[in-house]
Amino acid sequence: MIKKHIVRCTVILVLLVAAGVFAYHMPTTAKSHSENGTTTLKDTTQTTPKAAVPLSHMAQLNFADETLPLGDARVERKMKMVLTAYTYGRLQTNRLHRKAAEWFPVIEPILAAYGIPDDFKYIALVESGLQEGTSHKGASGIWQFMPGTARIYGLKVNRKIDERKNLRKSTIAAAKYIKELYHIFDSWTLVAAAYNVGDVHIQKQINKQNQDNYFKLKLNRETGGYVYKLISMKEVVENPARYGYRPAKGLIAYRQENKFKAYN
């Protein structure tokens, strides 16, 4: 009789232990009540949040097919920081996407006609996508040409007319300028940097530092971050959902009348 009791207790104990182990591996559930009064179970198991810019995605980032130097912690950290600055959570506007839809149909075929990589269209957004007008240095238009440079590449700039504000004509001028810069540097990232600060300055830094890799050159803060901005602009325009952008409805839109016109 005692043996039967011991065997019965042992079986019960084994079943309890097995049930405990099974419960330990089950996801936690919580009850929730819907409007119609029915009760459903909701899985509350915690998951690891995704990184803002996974390393696998970082390897795919590029400007005009020139990629980031992988394994460079400084470059990767800077890229993540600039990308974060262009998320919807930071900008709170879809103005960039509206400008891209308005400008790119005019810009893209012109760049292609001059053999310029399509990614250079993002210079227009970086220069004028969030804020248009004339800079304190005198640069104006979507491509932010200085008066002297604009005239060199065929634009009329005087008291009566300023073709820097003509999307089509200024894009043709920009394409000519970019193509000329490529003949000097033979690197699209260096061309972008030279567009920002001037070819003389970039050439001087290349000679001084004996370095012709944009990502390894020590440049001033604005130029040193310029290509990172272009890559970030490309990312948020081509992959809007990844960076928090939603359809225009409900967004805090930046309302400003477009001052530029495209002429055929």
Language model features: what each stretch is:
Residues 2-114, 245-251, 258-263:
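An acidic, Gly/Ser/Thr/Pro-rich helix-cap/linker signature
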Residues 43-86, 141-144, 148, 158, ...:
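Catalytic and substrate-binding regions of cell-wall glycan-acting enzymes that process beta-1,4-linked
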Residues 89, 93-104, 113-116, 135-143, ...:
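Solvent-exposed, acidic/flexible segments
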Residues 105, 109, 121, 172-179, ...:
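Solvent-exposed, polar/charged alpha-helical surfaces in well-ordered, non-transmembrane soluble domains
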Residues 109-112, 151, 207:
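Short polybasic/polar patches that bind polyanions
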Residues 133, 152-153, 205:
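Residues that scaffold the ATP/ADP-binding catalytic core of kinase and kinase-like folds
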